[in-house]
């Protein structure tokens, strides 16, 4: 925090009182409570957000490595982390996995590895088809939010189809 802002920030316990406006962030569920609690005050309430990547198969290795940074930073927990890929029909994931290998050391983090093992087991026990490189699973799924150590993907026929979908789902991304 910038030092000049210290005098403007107050931490309180209990019920908030004497404030003019609210900025809050949290899950979609938490946002419902914020909206109710702060209904009489001007507010900016941010809900869950997910980031997506639209691939067309012409990406360079360097671009895919950059995508890996966007997937793995903060273990995938940030709102700007890519949790969903849109790929053309018959997309070959070989180049994608080759680029992701640059982040293979992430599996050395115990909590990440536990999430990887758990989510992979849940997916396999549910008979989902997975692509796996021993530290990241990718699963075909229409959802935007994927669990830690996994990325969802969806095939597309045309970029216009993806553009339309992203416009329609703008409140989620």
Tell what function each PLM region has:
Residues 17, 80, 168:
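Structured loop/turn residues at beta-strand edges in well-structured enzyme cores
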Residues 21, 29:
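N-terminal Rossmann-like or analogous alpha/beta NTP/dinucleotide-binding catalytic cores
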Residues 20, 83, 171-172:
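Conserved acidic residues
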Residues 143-173:
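Long, low-complexity C-terminal extensions of enzymes
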Residues 8-18, 140-141:
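Short acidic low-complexity segments
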Residues 1, 26:
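Conserved small-residue-rich beta-alpha loop and adjacent elements
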Residues 23-25, 45-46:
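Short beta-strand segments
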Residues 3, 31-147:
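ALDH superfamily catalytic-core signature
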């Amino acid at each position: 925090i910038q030092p000049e802002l210290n005098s403007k920030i107050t931490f309180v316990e209990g019920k908030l009182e004497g404030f003019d406006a609210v900025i809050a962030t949290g899950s979609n569920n938490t946002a419902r409570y914020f909206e109710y609690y702060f209904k009489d005050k001007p507010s900016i309430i941010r809900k869950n957000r997910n980031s997506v990547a639209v691939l067309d198969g012409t990406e360079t290795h360097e671009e895919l490595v950059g995508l890996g940074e966007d997937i793995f930073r903060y273990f995938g927990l940030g709102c700007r982390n890519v949790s969903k890929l849109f790929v053309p029909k018959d997309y070959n994931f070989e180049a994608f996995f080759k680029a992701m290998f640059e982040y293979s050391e992430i599996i050395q983090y115990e909590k990440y590895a536990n999430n990887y093992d758990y989510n992979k087991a849940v997916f396999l026990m549910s008979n989902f088809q997975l692509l796996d490189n021993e530290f990241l699973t990718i699963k075909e799924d229409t959802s935007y939010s994927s669990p830690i150590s996994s990325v969802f993907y969806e095939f597309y026929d045309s970029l216009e189809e993806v553009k339309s979908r992203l416009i329609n789902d703008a409140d989620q991304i």
